[in-house]
């Protein structure tokens, strides 16, 4: 279910402060965050945000196409290594 338009997008306050500070700097460093639930806003375009995936930080360079998505959508938490049986069947043939 989508979020109500009258509420606006959710962005953690501490992340928004870091974004505004980075926009003021001439050469901003990547922003490190654990806030996967925050929505990407137009203020974040052009910044690199390191999003935590549970183990390490995944760098996400924000472009116009990312606006409206959540930060967590670009930092997968699980690695798919394939189904066990399918590799053994290919080798056996």
Swiss-Prot record:
PROSITE patterns: RIBOSOMAL_S19. It comes from the Bacteria. One of its GO terms (biological process) is ribosomal small subunit assembly. It holds the Pfam family Ribosomal_S19. InterPro entries: Ribosomal_uS19, Ribosomal_uS19_bac-type, Ribosomal_uS19_CS, Ribosomal_uS19_SF. PANTHER family: RIBOSOMAL PROTEIN S19P FAMILY MEMBER (PTHR11880), SMALL RIBOSOMAL SUBUNIT PROTEIN US19M (PTHR11880:SF8). Belongs to the universal ribosomal protein uS19 family. Protein S19 forms a complex with S13 that binds strongly to the 16S ribosomal RNA. This is Small ribosomal subunit protein uS19. The lineage of its organism: Bacteria, Pseudomonadati, Campylobacterota, Epsilonproteobacteria, Nautiliales.
């Amino acid at each position: 279910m989508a979020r109500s338009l009258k509420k606006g997008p959710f962005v953690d306050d501490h992340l928004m402060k870091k974004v505004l500070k980075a926009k003021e700097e001439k050469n901003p460093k990547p922003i490190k965050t654990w806030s996967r639930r925050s929505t990407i806003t137009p203020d974040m375009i052009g910044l690199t945000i390191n999003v935590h995936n549970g183990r390490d930080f995944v760098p996400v360079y924000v472009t116009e196409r990312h606006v409206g998505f959540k930060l967590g959508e670009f930092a997968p938490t699980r690695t798919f290594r394939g189904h066990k049986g399918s590799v053994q069947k290919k080798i056996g043939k």
